[in-house]
Amino acid sequence: MTNALLSIAVLLFSMLSLAQAETHTFNWTTGWDYRNVDGLKSRPVITCNGQFPWPDITVNKGDRVQIYLTNGMNNTNTSMHFHGLFQNGTASMDGVPFLTQCPIAPGSTMLYNFTVDYNVGTYWYHSHTDGQYEDGMKGLFIIKDDSFPYDYDEELSLSLSEWYHDLVTDLTKSFMSVYNPTGAEPIPQNLIVNNTMNLTWEVQPDTTYLLRIVNVGGFVSQYFWIEDHEMTVVEIDGITTEKNVTDMLYITVAQRYTVLVHTKNDTDKNFAIMQKFDDTMLDVIPSDLQLNATSYMVYNKTAALPTQNYVDSIDNFLDDFYLQPYEKEAIYGEPDHVITVDVVMDNLKNGVNYAFFNNITYTAPKVPTLMTVLSSGDQANNSEIYGSNTHTFILEKDEIVEIVLNNQDTGTHPFHLHGHAFQTIQRDRTYDDALGEVPHSFDPDNHPAFPEYPMRRDTLYVRPQSNFVIRFKADNPGVWFFHCHIEWHLLQGLGLVLVEDPFGIQDAHSQQLSENHLEVCQSCSVATEGNAAANTLDLTDLTGENVQHAFIPTGFTKKGIIAMTFSCFAGILGIITIAIYGMMDMEDATEKVIRDLHVDPEVLLNEVDENEERQVNEDRHSTEKHQFLTKAKRFF
C-alpha cells in the first residue's frame, strides 16, 4: 500500500511539473549589418532579425525550447550549437554540421526543438560553422531551477570576448595559408565585455550579486578580477560547486564561472573591473595592442571613474581542478574504454599548418555522422564506416570512458566535450620549452592520487606540453564532438568524434530525423544515407571520401635524392674547376679561358679596354684581377 501511494505521489508530481513547464518559441533570421563594437572600427557583424547583439535566452528547467533559425545570409551556410546542453534523446539538435545535421543553406530554415530536462545553470549558444560566432552569432543560455542552494539579491551576466576588426572568413584565408607555415593565430584588436568596451555596472551597497561570467570568445583565455572585491565561485559550466573564494579567475574560451560578489557599504568610491589577455597565447604582441581592458563597478555616479587596477601577480588565480562539486559524485572506477590522443600542430604537403589528434586532422564526411548511424543497420558499431579522417570512436552503452590527452604543443588548449560533463581526474603542470623542458605525457604508473570526488565540467584546458585525464559514463546515446574550442584550431582540424551507443540511437524514436531535417539537407544537396563517402551499397567502401592532405614525406624522396646527387656533383665540379684555374699561371689561365669557352679574342680585348679603368678604380685591392687584364692585353 505504501509503495502504491508513493508511486501515485511521484506520478502526480511529474504531471504537475509538466503542467508548469513552458514552451519558448523564437523565430530568428540571420543577416549582415555594420557595427562599431569597440569604438574604433565599424565592421560587418551577423545580426539576429536585424539586431545586434544576439538575445540571451532564459528558461526554467523542464521547459521546451523551439528556435526556428532561418539563414538570411546569401553567401554562407550556418548552424547553431547549444554549448553544454546534453541533448539527451535529441542528438540531432546539437547543431554541428556534418556530425548531427546538414548545414543550413541560404534561405533555409531549421527548427531546433528540445527540452532542457538535465541541465541547470549557465550555458551559451553559438554558430558551429566556420568561426561565425567570432562575427557575433552567439548569446547566453540561462537555465534556472528552484533548487539552487545559494542566496543572492540580484544577478548580472558578463560575456567576455576578444574582438577582431576583420571578418573571420578574411582572417582564415591568411591563417590557413602557405604564407603562415607556423600556424600563428590572428591577433585580436581588443578585449570586450557584453559586446562593448568600458562597460559600466551600477551596483547597490551591501548587496549580494550573482555574476555569470562567460568567455564567449574564440581564441584567447582571459584573467578577470574586480578591484578590492572577492568573488565566491558557486558554479562552473553548469555544475554547482561548494563555495570557493578567490580574487582572480582564469577563463578559457567556452568556460563559464558563476560567482557571488557582495558589495561594500561605503559608496564614496568606484572600482575597476579588469580583463587581461593571456598574452602567452599570442605569437606576437603588436605595439598598439592593449593587454588590459577596464570596465567600471559604479557605486556613486558622481564620483570619478577608476583607472586601471594593477596586481602584483597573475599567478594566483583560482585553479578550477580543485573545486568541489556541491552534489558529490565519486570518481568512476577503472575505465572500460581508454582513448589516448596526442596533440600536434604540423604542416601537410600543401604547405598549410594543421592540428592533429594522433596524426589525424578532422575532415568532415560527405554524410553527417548521425545520419550514417541511422542508416547503417547492424554495421553502426564499425568505426571504419564513419571515415578515415573523422577520427571516430565507438562507445558501448554505459561503459566508463577515459580520455587521456597529451599535449605535444607549446600552447594552452581548452577542450570541450559535447553531450557530457566529465570528471576531471588529472591535469599536469606546464612544461616550459623556454626552460628546456620537453612534452610530458601522462604516465598511468606514476601520477598524483586521483581526487575522491572530482570536479565536473564540459570544457577543460591543458597546459603547454602537458596532459590531462577525464572520465565520463557513456549514458547519453548520440554523436558527440570532442574538440579544441580555440576556433582557429578547430578550423585546423583539432577534433574527434564519439559515436555513443549507436544501436540505442537507432532504436530511439526521439533520435530519428524530422522532415525539417531532411528538407535542410535537400536544400544544401547533402546526402542523408550511407557511409562517410555517401556509399549506400557497400558501407566499408570509402572510395571518394573527404580526406586530409598528404603528409610531407620524411627523409628524401626519389626526386630529392636525384636532385641532391646532381647538386653535389655540380658543386664538386665547381670546386675542382676553381682549384685547377687557381694553380695555373695567370697567362696560361687566360689562354685556357679563351680556348675552352670559344671566346673571340678581339671581343675580349675590347671589353678589357672599356672596363679596365672602371675595374681598377672600383677595386684597387684586387691586384690579381689587374694583372690578369694587363696580361690579356699583351697576349693580343
Swiss-Prot record:
Pfam families: Cu-oxidase, Cu-oxidase_2, Cu-oxidase_3. Residues 1-21 form the signal peptide. Cu cation 4 binds at residues 413, 484, 489. The chain crosses the membrane at residues 560-584. Residues 22-559 are extracellular. It comes from the Eukaryota. Residues 585-636 are cytoplasmic. It catalyses: 4 Cu(+) + O2 + 4 H(+) = 4 Cu(2+) + 2 H2O. It is found in: Cell membrane. Induction: By iron deprivation. Repressed by iron excess. One of its GO terms (cellular component) is endoplasmic reticulum. GO terms for biological process: arsenate ion transmembrane transport; cellular response to iron ion starvation; intracellular copper ion homeostasis; intracellular iron ion homeostasis; iron ion import across cell outer membrane; iron ion transmembrane transport; reductive iron assimilation; response to copper ion. Gene3D superfamilies: Cupredoxins - blue copper proteins. One of its GO terms (molecular function) is oxidoreductase activity, acting on metal ions, oxygen as acceptor. Cu cation 1 binds at residues 81, 416. Its cofactor is Cu cation. Keywords: Cell membrane, Copper, Glycoprotein, Ion transport, Iron, Iron transport, Membrane, Metal-binding, Oxidoreductase, Repeat, Signal, Transmembrane, Transmembrane helix, Transport. Present with 1050 molecules/cell in log phase SD medium. This is Iron transport multicopper oxidase FET3. It comes from Saccharomyces cerevisiae (strain ATCC 204508 / S288c).
